[in-house]
Amino acid sequence: MTVSDSSPNSPWHSFPRKVWRTGLKWIADLRVAIALLLLISVFSILGTVIEQGSTIQFYQENYPEDPALLGFLSWKVLLGLGLDHVYTTWWYLVLLLAFGVSLIACTFRRQLPALKTARNWNYYSQARQFNKLALSTELDHGSLQSLKPQLEKKRYKIFQDGEKLYARKGIVGRIGPIIVHIGMIVTLVGSIWGAFGGFMAQEMIPSGVNFKVNNVFKAGIFSESDRPWSVNVNRFWIDYTPTGDIDQFYSDLSVVDGEGQELERKTISVNHPLRYDGITFYQTSWSIGGVQVQLNNSPIFQLPAAQIPTENGAKLWGSWVPIKPDMSAGVSILMQDLQGSAIVYNEQGELVGAVRVGDRLDVGDISLKLVDLVGSTGLQIKADPGVPVVYTGFLLVMLGVVMSYVSYSQVWALAAGDRFYLGGKTNRAQVAFERELLEIINTLETSHSQATPENTLTSIEQ
């Protein structure tokens, strides 16, 4: 490199600045923003259609290599691209970041300059300046003093300098697009924050058991699931319809501190979760966790139950109850639901009989009492610190959209000798603005006018 190459006037010296300006201009292009938004939408739809966070076996069964879905989407491709966790993949987050940068660049390059232009205005001091307005008229009489009350009635903000007048209203319509951009950026920040700081967990907890959130299957790199409190499942139950179908299932949950003091309590059901300390507990499923039985006059004891796979996919749970002290013999108890009935089989697989909760059944010389069926609540536990931020962003977007529909209207007037010039323009609702201006002109004209507003109002489009 020579001395001349390092001088301020060297082309190499200005090269980084040119690259920066070119890149900024490109990223601020509306077409680029739309393309990024479309890509984000497509991958978001894929994340909705394709089950997220399932096991490899699930994807192998539902997305086989032969035949592959759409000819190419096999489980290997799906996992390789990260389509099993779309919203936390590096490329999805890069798209969100790029879209946010595009919005910021567009805001500073287009929207803020447009607002600045709207706030900077000039008086019209020459008649020919009115010719460039979409709507203008020339009257042989009129005054600014008679015009000002009419504009004030229409809620215009008025500025006057001698015989020159400028009025405007609806500048909030210029601020609206900026608010929309800010709202979208806030929404993106909330989404990224939720992806990095949130987690999801699943728990299957029997009634009467205390638990902490441990079974986390999806977590952001900055997430923290450990909390100084735990949750008691006070009770789980199911309401059934008269036909035996499930109507709704409920969990009575209590949040307790390390000393057992209750901090929060709520009975949750499907679509009615418990929210506490940034974590939401959703009621999603259920199971039979165990059975409580009594043999003759023995103490009541609880045995675990396990789900048994069936050919038709029907739900079935079973438990084994020893009937001898050395556990050398026992019976099997099968249950389909929590309606209080069970079927008992001996070791040979022969039916002993059916029994309901609270009833006894003789098994040889043993009297077996079915005390209770213990239900387990299936909870989906989710923490997303970005949710309040996302909601705030949505509110800002909606507010900005409403503001954007406000028309930004401008009116100029000039009293020059015995001539009076009046004109204006608006960025939307052209017909309504024309009627408004005609109404003002009609008020200004006297009965001795030589022409009517209809034939004096002109449009540069004609």
Swiss-Prot record:
The keyword Transmembrane applies. It comes from the Bacteria. It is a multi-pass membrane protein. GO terms for cellular component: plasma membrane-derived thylakoid membrane. InterPro entries: Cyt_c_bgen_Ccs1/CcsB/ResB (IPR023494), ResB-like_domain (IPR007816). The chain crosses the membrane at residues 30-50, 89-109, 175-195. Required during biogenesis of c-type cytochromes (cytochrome c6 and cytochrome f) at the step of heme attachment. May interact with CcsA. This is Cytochrome c biogenesis protein CcsB.
